[in-house]
Amino acid sequence: MVLIQVQFDKQYPVYAFDTACFYTDEETALDHKLQELRANLSKAMESGITPPEKAALNAEIKQTKEALKQLIDQNIGLVRTVRKEAQRPSNIVQVFESTLIRNLQMVPDDLNECMIIVRVYYFGVAESIIKNGFYMDGEKYVFFSASAGQIRTKKFVAIQESRLNACMNALTCGLPVEEINEHGGVNINKYLAYLALCNSATQLWKDFDINRCIVIDDFETVVNGMVDFIDEKTYDITRKEMGVPITHTDGCGMILPILSKKNFMVRAPWIKGLLSPFDFYKFIREANKRDPSKDHAWITDIYGNKHHVIKERIQIIFTKSQFKMWKYYDSFDTYKKNFKKYRCTAGKTNIEPSIINKATINYQMLQTLTSMTDEELSNICAATNRALSRISSDRTTMLRVLGADSKNQNKGYFQKCLELYPEMLQDEHCKITLREMKRSMEIDARAGKLMIDGKYQFLIPDLYAACQYWFEGIDTPEGLLSGNEVWTRLYPNAEQLDVLRSPHLYKEHAVRPNTYKAKPLIKKWFNTNGIYTSTHDLISKILQFDNDGDKSLVVADSTIISVAERECDDVVPLYYPMAKAAAAQITPTALYDGMVAAWTNGNIGAISNQISRIWASNHPDTDAVKILCMENNFIIDYAKTLYQPTRPPKWDERIRNATNGKVPAFFKYAKGKFDHQVNPRGNGVVDRLFNTVQIYKFRFNSAAIGHFDYRMLMYDENIPYGEKEEKIVSEFRREASHMGTPNVSMYDDNNHYFWNVKEMRKKFLQYGSLQYITDVLVRGMFHEHHVSRKSAFFDCFGDQVYQNLLNNLPKKTRLCLRCGKRFIISDPHQNYCKDCEPLDKPREIKTAECVLCGAKFKTRNVESGSICPACKMIGREHTQCAGKKEHVLNCVDCGAPLDAYVFGRPSTRCPHCQSIRNKRNVKKWKIKHRSNT
C-alpha cells in the first residue's frame, strides 16, 4: 500500500480510449454480442453447466470473435471516428507535464482534447489508426509515438494533426522525416523511442543555453578481465580472459557545478541521458599547471570541429551516445541554429534528492544467495521485523510507515497534516490505514521485500578519467578509482558495498571496496550523491547498466555483503555479442510493423519466472541461468534488431528440465498466485522468509499519541450543522465510494482517480467556500458519523485542513515522546515535557563532518551521513572551502564572504544585504496591513 501526493498543477487531463472506442456500428454490435456471450458463460459456470453446453457457448464465442476480427481486418483502410458514447469521464486520465504538453499548450484545469492515448486490444484497429489517423468531433488525429512504458502496455499517443504540425519542428529541432529518409532512414523503434522523449515527465529547464553546449565522442576503453563468453549460435559457454570494449560514458555527460550541484536526467530534442556535475574548468587549469606546454582546453566535437572550452564558456558537455540523431545534422551549429529558430526547450527529470532514504531489497537479489543460512537470513530480516512489531505501538514508527516524517520529501496533504498533528493517529482512518499497511508489509516481506541498509544511487563513471581521456589525450587513463573500487559519500564509514541493479537474474552481486576514507582527496572532484565506478572494472557488464540515468541499489548491510562475497567468489561477467539494429525508411507501414514487433516480442517476465524456478530448486543449474540471461537481453532488443537466437535442441531440453514445474511458493506473495499455482514451500532463500518474518497481532497503543480534537482541523468550529450540511456529507461519502483507489503509479496512464478528485473538488465548491465545505466535511466525517475511510477527503480538501492546522495549533509545541502530551518547547532538541524530562538523558554535543562539504560542525546526532546546517538550509548552493575546520559561506545577494559558524543556524546574507532585505520586508508589511481609512 502506497500513499501518493496528488499534485493538481502538474497533471493534465486527456482521453484514453481502447480500440473498441473506434469501432463502426457493425463492429460494435458484434462486440456487444461477444460481451453478452461471455457474461452468459460466466453466469452458467456459477449456476452449473454441462460440458456440451459449455462447449457450445465457447464455440459461439469463438465464432463471434473470429467474425469481429475479420470485419476489423476488412476495415484496415477505413479512417475511423471516436464513438460519441466513448467520450465520458471514465475514459479521462491524467498525464504529467512534459515538453510535449508544454508545446501543445495544454492546461491542467480542463480536459485537453489535443492529445489522446490509445490502448490496443485488436491490432487491426491500431493498424488503421497508425496508417490513416482518425477523427473526433470533426478534428483529425494522427499517430505520434509511444514511450517505452507505453509500448510495454500496448499503448500509443495520437495528437490533433493541426496542433502537431504547428509544434513538430520544436519537438524535432527542425529534422523532418523526409530528411531522415534521404540519409538512409533509421531504425524504426529507435526513432519512435527518441521521438517519445518529449513525452517524458519533465520540468522546464528555464535557463538552459544551447550556446554553452558541445557534443564530443564518448570515453571508450578496452578493459581486460575474465568473462563467461557465450556463443549466441551454439550456446557454448567458455570462461576466458579477454579485452572487453566498454563505453564508460554511455548516456552520461558533464555539467559545471555552478549550474547544478545535483545529478539529473536531461531531455531535449533527440538528446537524453544523465548530466553529472564535474568541474572540468578546474581540471583544465590543473592540467595546464602540470604541463604548461599545451593548452588542455581544446577539444574536438563529434563533427571534427575544435573548441576552446574556456574561451567559448562551455558549461555542458554532451556525449555522442546522448545525441541520438547526430548523424542527420551536418554540424552541431546546425542543431543549435534550429534549436533557437524553432524555440526548442530542454527539460529536467529525476533530479537527485538531497537526502536519499533507505530502500528495500527484492526477491531477485535474495534468491541468488543460495548458501544463506537461517541465522544470516534472520539478521537481514531484523529491521523489517522490528518495524512490524512497532507499527501499532510506537508513534515514530507509525509516522515513518505512513510517510509523515522529515525523510519523506514528497508528502501528500494527509501526510503533511499527520506530521504537523500526530494526534490524528487516534482517528479511525489512520488506524485502518496502519492495519492495512502492516498487512501489506507482511506480504511484501514474505515476497522478499525487506528493509535493509541500502540506497538507490545514480551510477556515474570516473569523470576524472574521462577528462584525462578528452583533455589530456590519454588513451587508457588511470582516473581517481583504480581496480574495482567505487566511491560514494553516502556511506563514508562502509569499507565495502554490494552494488546491485534490477533486473537481477544471475549472481549480479558486485561487492566493491568503497574508497571514501582511503582516498579523501577524491571528494574534491566527486561531490554528488551518486556512486562512482572505476573505468578499470567490468562492473557495467556484471550489472548490465548504462550511465544514462540507471540507478543501483547500493547495500551496506554487512550480512548481505559477507554472503554475497562467499556466493560470488567464482562469478565473472557474462559476455556475448549483440545484434545490430538495421535502418529503414520511415513510412506508416514501417511504423506499424515496428509497434507490432515491440508489442509481441517483449515478454521478459516469462524468462524471469523461469530463472526463479531454477534458483528455488535444490540444485540450481547456473549454466541454464546464464543462457536465459542472454536470451532475455536479446528479447529486450528484439523490437530494434528483429533478431533472436535459435536455441539448440540440447539446450532446449536442458532448460525445460531445469524450469519444469510450478513457480516457487513465495510467488503467492510476490505475484498474487493461488495455492494450486505454486510449488510446496521449499528450502530456497525467499521461501524460508515465511517462517523468518515475524507476524504480530495489531494492538493499537495510544499511550504516547495524545488527545485528538477534530476541531483543530476546522477553520470555524462554530459552523452550523443542519439538514443542508448533512446532505453535503452524505453526497460526498456516496461519491467517494465510487472514486476508485489512489494506490496506482503517478506515472500510470490509467490514473482515473486523480481526475475524479479534481472534478469532485470542483463540484463541491459550488456549495460554498473552500473553508465552509472543508469544515462541514470535517464535522460530518470526524464527529457526527466517525467515517473510517477518509482518503478521498484528504486528497480533495487536505490543503485547507493543513492550513487550518497551521493556524490552530499553538506555536513552538510538540508531543512528548513518553506521555504524548503537547507542550511548549524551550529548546529545539527538547523531546519530553517537564513531567517526563528527568527521564530524558540529553545527548552530548559532538563534532561531526558534513558528508556534503566536509566542514566540521557541532551536533547531538553524530551518525553516518551527517549534514551540516548550512548544507541543509541552502542546499550547498553557496558553500565553499570544503574540508576546512570552518564552514565559509557567500552572501546569496552580493557574494561577499560571511563569517564562519561553529554551531547553530547560519545566515545566508551579509549584514548589509540583510538590513536592506529587512527594510524592504517592513515596507511590504506596512503596505499590506495599512488601514483603508
Region spans (language model):
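Beta-strand-enriched accessory nucleic-acid recognition/scaffold domains that flank the catalytic cores
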Residues: M1-Q544, K551, D557-H887, D893-G895, ...
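Flexible, glycine- and charge-enriched loops at secondary-structure boundaries
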Residues: S915
